[in-house]
């Protein structure tokens, strides 16, 4: 498992809305304000840049807002609203490639027109897509594009293992096409493949779940005929075989 440190900056801007109608509470008048919050990353030089390793950010506003749970999917993950009251909100950062999340609380106040809060993240990065996305904002220990390509080749080779003597035994599907089809599947489909393999697992099958590496290894030639047919049908419905 690779732990990557990143610093993100939550930036708040607010001002009194010109011509806005003031709210009155307990004989006190509160002007309506417009405010915005956005999330950026600090690079190694301390400069603000897009948090490219973030998939989306969810803001849980005060329940008096219409649709108080807001999810923003594009950098700088900015939300804009109007209101008169200060309040505490929960913010959730979701990492790329389904690589986890980070939750924290942020208090929206109107003492300053512009202010920011820096948040230190310790990201346990196991997903290849997250590791690659993190390289845009700084160093990632032990990661390189060349290493990722090597891992892809390794997965491909393992899915095709046994092409020699194991091919002597007739199989109910074209094993080469099945191996190619599995390589073309999207991540959500691959998760279903893992589930099908686990549900039909037998003692003769070679299956290895590398949790730390975020990889799932299978020897297709050790799978029973019924599972091969199931996987082939699954792939054929989703990719060109």
From Swiss-Prot:
Stretch list, region Disordered: 141-169
GO molecular function: histone binding; RNA polymerase II general transcription initiation factor activity
Disulfide partners: none
Annotated Gene Ontology cellular component terms: chromatin; Ino80 complex; nucleoplasm; nucleus; SWI/SNF complex; transcription factor TFIID complex; transcription factor TFIIF complex
The YEATS domain, residue ranges: 1-137
Gene: tfg3
Membership in a protein family: Belongs to the TAF14 family.
Name of the protein in its database record: Transcription initiation factor TFIID subunit 14
Compositional bias annotation for Basic and acidic residues: 149-159
The keyword Nucleus is assigned to this record: yes
Domain of life of the organism encoding this protein: Eukaryota
Membrane-crossing residue ranges in chain numbering: none
Assigned keywords, A-Z: Chromatin regulator, DNA damage, Nucleus, Transcription, Transcription regulation
Subunit and interaction comment: Component of the fcp1/TFIIF/polII complex via interaction of tfg3 with both tfg1/TFIIF-alpha and tfg2/TFIIF-beta subunits. Component of the SWI/SNF global transcription activator complex composed of at least arp9, arp42, snf5, snf22, snf30, sbf59, sol1, ssr1, ssr2, ssr3, ssr4 and tfg3. Also interacts with the TATA-binding protein (TBP). Component of the mst2 complex composed of at least eaf6, mst2, nto1, pdp3, ptf1, ptf2 and tfg3.
UniProt-listed Pfam families: BET (PF17035), YEATS (PF03366)
PANTHER family: YEATS DOMAIN (PTHR23195)
Magnesium found in the keyword field: no
Source organism: Schizosaccharomyces pombe (strain 972 / ATCC 24843) (Fission yeast)
Localization per Swiss-Prot or TrEMBL: Nucleus, Nucleoplasm
Job description of the protein: Functions as a component of the DNA-binding general transcription factor complex TFIID, and the RNA polymerase II associated general transcription factor complex TFIIF. Binding of TFIID to a promoter (with or without TATA element) is the initial step in preinitiation complex (PIC) formation. TFIID plays a key role in the regulation of gene expression by RNA polymerase II through different activities such as transcription activator interaction, core promoter recognition and selectivity, TFIIA and TFIIB interaction, facilitation of DNA opening and initiation of transcription.
